[in-house]
Structures are given as C-alpha cells and as structure tokens.
Amino acid sequence: MFNNTVTLYNYDKFKDDYYYTVFKNVEVQEQQRSIPDDTHHGDYNNIYERAYDRALLIIKYKFIDGIKLVDGVPKTFLDPKEWNNTEDKSNNFTFQTDCDFFIVEENKEIKSFEELKNYKDRVYKIDIYDDYEYDLTHWEVYGA
C-alpha cells in the first residue's frame, strides 16, 4: 500500500492554464468495468462496450500549525477558493471538483483532461474529495 505516484493538475480559470503537483507514496484503488453499449441500433454484430473507470486516491498529510503538508511535496494545500484567489499558485495545490484531474504516473506534460485522456490510461477527473483532518489525517480523492 501507498506505493503509487500520481500527478495532480490544478486548473487556473483566470489564466486558462494548469499547475501540476507530483505525489509519491500514495494509494490508488482503481475500478474498471465494461458497460454494454446500446447504441448499435439493431446491428447485433457490432455491440461495443464502453469502459467505466473510477479511482480512489488516498494522500496522507501532516497537520502542523494549521498547515497541511505532504511528505516530499514542497507545496502547501489551500482550499479551492483560497487557491483561486492566490497570486502564486505554483507553490500551492488544491482539489477542485469541477476542473482538476490526476493521472497515475509522474507526468510533467501539461495538457487538458481531454487531451491527456485521449492518449493515456489511468487519467481521472476529480468529482469528490473528502478531508479527514481530525482522524488519520488524509484526503480521499475520487475521480472518474
């Protein structure tokens, strides 16, 4: 457990640009399944399946003097609104459920979610994240 590497991409809506953060020693639990495609319109020789992928990303952090720090990551976590309003986004990261995504590998190539998804596997758009600040301090980030 906790032997995966992921790259998180944060989208800056004001500059239309992405900032990336590499996390090592995180846990990724992936689910893949196929869903029958019902768009064949009577052509039963052409029944395709679409893959449905989901991932749970678990990132441990330390809560020191009100700051959330991840081992090996020289950046500070900020809540999404605070991150969007800060000038220096390169020294911080966040989890935005409407536009951020992650890939299960170290990848410093910055492209949009759609571009990266077209030629890489294991790319997930963040749709939920939970912050477990008062228990075993960690984030659970869900993506599809």
Question: Where would I find each of the regions flagged by the language model?
Answer:
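N-terminal intrinsically disordered, low-complexity, charge/repeat-rich segments that act as generic
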Residues: 1-23
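Short, conserved turn/kink motifs that form compact alpha/beta structural patches or helix kinks used as
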Residues: 21-144
